[in-house]
Amino acid sequence: WFEQWLSDVHLRAFLKRLPDFDDLEAEEKAFAHAQAYPDVHSALAFLLRWPAPAEAAKLIVTRKADLDGNLYELMTPAAEALSARYPLAATLALRSMIDFTLESGKSGRYRHAARHLGECGALAPHIDDFADIGSHQTYTAELKRRHGKKHGFWSLVT
């Protein structure tokens, strides 16, 4: 069941039946399976429920292009759960929602997207290496270039 559906309930039951130390190896295999699971959002939800924040952060960073920012009910708690120890992953979750909102013209979500952009700004000083995603300043400049005419959004950005 676990491998097909990423059921944390089934995995916990399975791990309880294993001898000491075998459970750690099985848990590592489960995390590896989650990292490669076809549905990145199901994998992220599993890793957050477990909880395995380091694995969730790794998933977000390695599969950032697959994230659907429309899934705010997943991305918001992911960003919250990861912000303290994994600010890069939290930033990527927030950016996925900002990008979706602006690219889709979801003006009803502008308030949230502006707040998310502010959260990204607050996380930025805690990120040592932005890798290939661009700094907060670079990201904000790119947003202005692509979505500068969305005054409803920019009027909410502080």
Residue ranges and their predicted role:
Residues 1-158:
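Eukaryote-biased, non-catalytic alpha-solenoid scaffold regions
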